[in-house]
From Swiss-Prot:
UniProt-annotated location(s): Cytoplasm
KW Calcium (keyword) present: no
Cellular-component GO terms for this entry: cytosol
Keywords per UniProt: Aminoacyl-tRNA synthetase, ATP-binding, Cytoplasm, Ligase, Metal-binding, Nucleotide-binding, Protein biosynthesis, Zinc
Subunit field text: Monomer.
Protein's gene: ileS
GO biological process: isoleucyl-tRNA aminoacylation
Stored NCBIfam families: ileS (TIGR00392)
Residues that coordinate or bind ATP: K600
UniProt-listed Enzyme Commission number(s): 6.1.1.5
Catalysed reactions listed for this entry: tRNA(Ile) + L-isoleucine + ATP = L-isoleucyl-tRNA(Ile) + AMP + diphosphate
Species: Lactobacillus delbrueckii subsp. bulgaricus (strain ATCC BAA-365 / Lb-18)
Protein's UniProt name: Isoleucine--tRNA ligase
């Protein structure tokens, strides 16, 4: 037998390389075949619930890194909650109605305007379901576990029926009404938009100053050559002007410039004078805003049209002139002010953004709104009322799908009246927990300031508004009509609205005093898609999915404060008086490595599927766990490669632990905590602290800290310390020796507990690790998080070993200096004498009996007494003297020893090794030992 054959060298089939792109798919198939998701829930039946309700991604195309961040975060939460013992189901969902589906069909050459509506909607449904299947495959490949065979999908009949009932309950409670008021209008989509469907981009717009001649100053202001001065960026709205708003609290000045007089906000006077080039002007009169109410101005270029002066507190002195041009059909503030003063709504624009015959200037009829800016400018100039024209760049509202500008346009729509139950919504926000905490203020302010919600859309693909109209135009919505439509939708889906005549959509024998002839028509608009997803708390119940209401958590990107968090809150409070969620967790956006938004034009997008093919889903999952996703997070191939280095460190550490516990049977070889060596007890205590802190961080949804704690423990406590000196015990000591079994107990515990703690983050790899451990559960996911132990001596151990670690730092510094001086090479070539200070000596006394030589990996260690030699190095905790070790290297333990050949039967070994080999391999005494 050779010397190396007497060593307890670790062996394992756990591969160094994960080969993740290939093997992950095999593990995922095994999860599904073995029904681990269902079995985990079965284990937790009857336990406290944790329901994370999935915000439905839109079913359109393969997933991107934002999807990966979101879905993996949810999976980490659900897995960790289940491993904590909660009953935590996960039901994935999809949002499947809306304009993007219609746009995709248009790209395929489908023209909805030439098709039967029901047939067109069937094409939409088919396309949407194809996208669901595509994304389902993508999400599962990320290692996301859930009830993938029974998702909730907004186009499913039972879901649509539930949505109809939500609408009906809101109508019954008095929260739904029809009105004509300005809403975001997308001429490119020919539909209204919700606030959540609007995004902002920089555009170049006109900036013009216009004078309105005073017609009636109410005895307070001269009409002769006197003008109200306004500023606007939308010349195309000037023909529809109905009034001028002034702030009742502001001071206004009448200034003389040449032969004209202008009324301007006093605080804006100097800025306006500079812009208009008034080198000299004279203030001739002061007015209060309240003085000007009900004064009348002439339209700046249309004969016979007047403009009423009205009070409005929203008028600011931040820009403009302090007087605001008002057109009721093209602005929410304009509308509200005009209504207070008894005006009819004037909105002379069609669905495509072109002016209708209602426009007071016939020259503009049929023209696209922005094309009229130059015409209006020229007419103002000809009338002598254009004082200044320039352009400027500013942020303007755009359709989030078409990327085209949108306008405020007054149209007849259906609304949810937020103002009627705003206080209830705000009260529910106060009762909700937010991660991060600032989310509460953000959502609160959004609800506090938001207007009523326009819920009707002029599109084809969506859930129809379940409204009928009588012969006299009266809208009909009753409990009976809602239930009849909902029951029909539950059986046939919402296409029934378009395949059945109105008589079959109404309850049998339905009559109304508003239809003496029994004739009815049905609404052609559909519900806003945000009403679809906003009703998901109800739809998922109607589908019989395992999600309780109110649910434990909603988790989505921070854009959903004005989207899904918002719409879900409104529908739930409106129908049931409670928020649909107990907590809300929001995430930032995924940016590239330089902090830029990802876009195809910049070429900086990363597809999760491409990363999976190159590196594996585990690397994406570890990236998700490593970042603080409460804000925006960067991702690039370079960043992912750095993450993969961290993964490699974790994997290699597990490989070492598995190899060196391969001959350890926890049932018979385990050493009880009280019998462990003190250094091993210390590591058990450190491991226990790690488990406790990790679970706390899981409960705070702070996965970045879980990862940091684990990685720090693996790197510092294990690799750089415990496992570094472990070889001297694991390889050298007797196979069944107390020292070796004591250390193996700790290493095995570390492998088990770290596998459990990392399982929610790295389920593929930790499942693989689990297969090499001797635990009763078939998979790590079927186990629970480690129990947190109560070690009575934990604080004393941490204090004593903490002092020793400071002493160790001093010794390592001394060894490094000796290495620099070429006195030694490796640390085992050294003989070290330590003269400890008081704190270190006290710690060493408490740790009496420990083999500090072994821990410091030196051949000889002496605790010096008496006077410190001059050549010793002075450090914080001790003085350290390093000399080259005497003797020869033992070929087995690699330490310098002076007792080689002490046992004549094994002359090449030191006394320690000879004793161990004789005990473990007595046959060698007969056969002899080769080098």
């Amino acid at each position: 037998m050779r010397v190396k054959d007497t060593l307890n060298l670790g062996k394992t089939k756990f591969p160094m390389r994960g080969n993740l792109p290939k093997r992950e798919a095999e593990w995922e198939k095994n999860w599904e075949d073995q029904k681990f998701y269902e079995r985990r829930l079965k284990l937790n039946e009857g336990h406290e619930r944790f329901d994370l309700h999935d915000g439905p991604p839109f079913a359109n195309g393969n997933i991107h890194m934002g999807h990966a961040l979101n879905k993996i975060t949810k999976d980490i939460i659900v897995r960790s909650k289940n491993m904590e013992g909660y009953y935590a189901p996960y039901v994935p969902g999809w949002d499947t109605h809306g304009l993007p589906i219609e746009q995709q069909l248009t790209k395929q050459g489908v023209d909805r305007k030439t098709m039967d509506r029901a047939a067109y909607r069937e094409l939409c449904r088919k396309f949407a379901m194809e996208q669901v299947e595509k994304q389902r495959t993508d999400f599962k490949r990320l290692g996301v576990m859930g009830d993938w065979d029974h998702p909730y999908i907004t186009l499913l009949p039972e879901f649509e029926a539930a949505e109809i009932r939500v609408f009906g309950k809101m109508y019954e409670n008095g929260y739904i009404y029809q009105g004509k008021k300005p809403v975001y209008w997308s001429w490119s989509s020919e539909s209204t938009l919700a606030e959540a469907e609007v995004e902002y981009h920089d555009v170049e717009s006109p900036s013009i100053y216009i004078s309105f001649p005073v017609k009636d100053g109410k005895g307070k202001l001269s009409e002769e050559n006197t003008y109200f001065l306004i500023w606007t960026t939308t010349p195309w709205t000037i023909p529809s002007n109905q009034g001028i708003a002034v702030n009742p609290k502001f001071d206004y000045s009448v200034v003389e410039v040449g032969d004209r007089r202008y009324v301007v906000g006093t605080d804006r006077l100097s800025a306006v004078a500079e812009i208009l080039g008034w080198d000299s002007y004279k203030t001739v009169q002061h007015l209060k805003g309240t003085d000007m109410e009900y004064m009348v101005a002439k339209h700046p270029y249309i004969e016979g049209r007047d403009s009423l002066l009205m009070e409005a507190v929203y008028v600011t002195d931040d820009d403009g002139t302090g007087l605001v041009h008002t057109a009721s059909g093209f602005g929410e503030d304009d509308y509200n002010t005009a209504m207070r003063y008894g005006f009819d709504v004037l909105s002379p624009m069609d669905n495509k953004g072109c002016f209708t015959e209602e426009i007071p200037d016939p020259d503009l009829v049929g023209k696209f709104y922005t094309d009229t800016n130059e015409i209006v400018k020229d007419k103002l100039s000809a009338a002598g009322n254009l004082l200044h024209y320039s352009t400027f760049v500013h942020s303007a509202a755009h359709d989030w799908r078409t990327k085209k500008p949108v306008v405020y346009r007054a149209t007849t729509q259906w609304f949810a009246s937020i103002s009627k139950f705003r206080d209830q919504i705000l009260d529910q926000i106060e009762k909700t927990t937010f991660y991060p905490a600032w989310g509460k203020t953000r959502l609160y302010n959004m609800i506090k300031d938001r207007g009523d919600w326009v819920i009707s859309r002029q599109r084809a693909w969506g859930v129809p508004l379940p409204i009928f109209y009588a012969e006299d135009g009266t809208a009909i919505v009753t409990h009976e009509t809602i239930e009849h439509v909902a029951d029909l939708f539950a059986k046939e889906g919402s296409n029934a609205w378009f395949t059945h005549p109105v008589e079959e959509l109404l309850p049998e024998g339905f009559t109304s005093e508003h239809s003496p002839n029994g004739k009815f028509t049905k609404e052609t608009d559909i519900l806003d898609v945000w009403f679809d997803s906003g009703s998901s708390w109800s739809g998922v119940q109607a589908l019989g999915r395992a999600v309780h209401y109110p649910t434990s958590m909603y988790l989505e990107g921070s854009d959903q404060y004005r989207g899904w968090f918002n719409s879900s809150l409104i529908t739930s409070v409106a129908t049931n008086g409670v928020a649909p969620y107990k907590s809300v967790l929001s995430q930032g956006f995924t940016l590239d490595g330089q902090g830029r938004k990802m876009s195809k034009s910049l070429g900086n997008t990363i597809a999760p599927n491409d990363v999976i093919k190159q590196m594996g889903a585990e690397i994406i999952r570890l990236w998700v766990a490593s970042v603080d996703a409460s804000g925006d997070v960067g991702v690039s191939m370079d960043i992912l490669r750095q993450v993969s280095e961290g993964y490699r460190k974790i994997r290699n550490t597990f490989r070492y632990m598995l190899a060196n516990t391969a001959d350890f049977d926890p049932e018979k070889d385990r050493v009880a905590y009280k019998d462990l060596r003190k250094i091993d007890q210390y590591l058990e205590v450190k491991l226990n602290d790690l488990v406790a802190e990790s679970i706390v961080n899981y409960d705070k949804y702070d996965f970045a800290d879980v990862y940091k704690l684990v990685f720090k423990f693996i790197t510092n406590d294990l690799s750089a310390f415990y496992l570094d000196f472990a070889k001297d015990v694991l390889y050298i000591e007797g196979k069944d020796s107390h020292a070796r079994r004591s250390m193996q107990t700790v290493i095995y515990d570390a492998a088990v507990k770290l596998a459990k703690i990392l399982a929610p983050i790295l389920p593929h790899t930790m499942g693989e690790v689990w297969g090499y451990l001797k635990e009763k559960e078939e998979d790590v996911y079927l186990s629970n998080f480690p129990e947190i132990e109560d070690y009575a001596d934990a604080d004393d151990l941490k204090e004593s070993w903490g002092e020793f670690m400071k002493l160790r730092d001093d010794v390592l510094k001394a060894l490094e200096e000796a290495r620099d001086q070429k006195l030694i090479g490796k640390s085992f070539e050294a003989s070290v004498t330590v003269y400890p200070g008081e704190a270190a000596k006290a710690a060493l006394d408490k740790l009496a009996g420990e083999d500090f030589r072994e821990i410091l990996i030196v051949s000889n260690l002496v605790m010096g007494q008496g006077e410190v030699p001059a050549e010793a190095k002075q450090f914080d905790q001790a003085s350290v003297l390093v000399r080259r070790a005497e003797g020869e290297v033992c070929p087995r333990c690699r330490m310098y020893r002076t007792d080689l050949g002490a046992d004549s039967r094994l002359p090449q070994l030191c006394g320690r090794c000879a004793s161990i080999v004789a005990g473990d391999h007595p046959e060698i005494l007969e056969e002899g030992l080769e080098d």
